[in-house]
Amino acid sequence: MKKRLLSALCAVMLLICAVPMASAQTGDAARWADALTVLHLLSEDPGRDLTTPATRAQAAVLLVRLAGGEKKPDTDGWFAGFRDVPDWARTAVNYANRRGWISGVSNVQFDPNGHLNADAWCAMLLRMLGYSDKTGDFEISDAAAFAWRIGLTGRQLIGILSMGDLAESIYDALDFCYKGTETTVLSRLMDLGVCTASAANALGLLNKDYTARQLADRYLSAAFQLSLYETEEQVHDEVSSADASGFFISADGLAVTNYHSIEDSIKATATLLNGETYEVERVLYYDTGIDIAVIKVSRTNQSRRTTSAFNHLDLVGTADIRPGDPVYAIGNPLGLGLAISSGIIGSTAHELDRYALPCIVNSADISRGSSGGALLNTHGQVIAVTSGAYTYGNNMYLAVPVDPVMAADLTVSGWTLKEVKAIEAAKNKD
């Protein structure tokens, strides 16, 4: 009992330490604002105060710039009907309202000087990207949480936003794709001539190399804690037999973990960074020798709320990796919560009897509970799945290549965890 209380206390302390500040840090905000100025998304203003609360009118103007609408502000003669919008924001407000991105506080009032809250701003961003609150993609009251869950924002925005918060969220949105496409916001801006590829490249936005902090902000929400149950009694008592890790590879809930993580389990749940828990529905692919599995996670959580999308990671495989390359591991060490660690690749093809494919040896720290997590390159792409370690080795951690998942047919109906357990039990009898 004491051990479980201590683990719970440690988890709470880690969570408290991980909670981001309510507003953008001044130094970071200035860097983001400078970058957006170079991209012509913010007006040049040496005296700008990024700590001041953002207004609804400012948000409308920045939203339209981010969409590339200011370059070609075609409103089809549309007038939103708001009588209180100042001249400098009128075209942007009409443009955004015409497309259903923003609305007023009444039929004739926009409240341009009203302070902007996180849910209102994230709802604007999401609509611009093709998500709809009207068709159930998100709820306005939950827009900021949804934006964080899908990786649009690097942290969950809360409360009244500052101009620095807007700069941060716009910067975060640059490498986010429009819904259902492979087109990023930045690539569309370049196509429209709002900014140039040379400017984006000079800012390090093309073929982006992330720092550990940037990867954590962007992709930690794509990983989850996997809780496993091996008996009906454990399921009934809601006491898991083990914890592991996993990560999403598609917005609709496809995810990867180790096979040994789900071995012998009859039920599994995935708990996200924000604390929401979703049940594992099916196993679409697994290989006991490679020690890898693809699972399908329900989009309805245990509170019976459904999400339209999850943040997810791209798979790139191991073809281009070399010893000495920096890597990052994300997972659930010791079951105490999602975390990131950094290291380098020591060997790209280490053979072990335990695995059917050569493993990647690296020095990014993992612990019990990290099995099934993602090993990332500096671009935030998955090269392997964290799997184990040498007990007596210093910084010798093992990861299995993700390449088989890239070649697998994931359109099959798959099996339940109980069916996988029965299939493997029958094989072992033979």
Residue ranges and their predicted role:
Residues 133, 311-357, 367-370, 387-397:
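Flexible, gly/ser-rich surface segments that form the specificity/activation loops bordering the active-site cleft
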Residues 2-32, 38-91, 98-161, 173-207:
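Feature responds to low-complexity, polar/acidic, surface-exposed segments characteristic
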Residues 166, 247, 366-386:
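Catalytic nucleophile loop of clan PA
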Residues 209-213, 228-258, 276-280, 314, ...:
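A conserved glycine-rich beta-strand in the N-terminal activation segment of trypsin-fold
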Residues 231-232, 250-331, 335-338, 356, ...:
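Conserved active-site neighborhood of the chymotrypsin/trypsin-like protease fold
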Residues 226, 246, 253, 257, ...:
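Terminal peptide-recognition signature
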Residues 64-65, 126-127, 171, 260, ...:
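Short, surface-exposed secondary-structure boundary micro-motifs
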Residues 201-217, 265, 269, 299-312, ...:
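C-terminal cap/linker of serine protease catalytic domains
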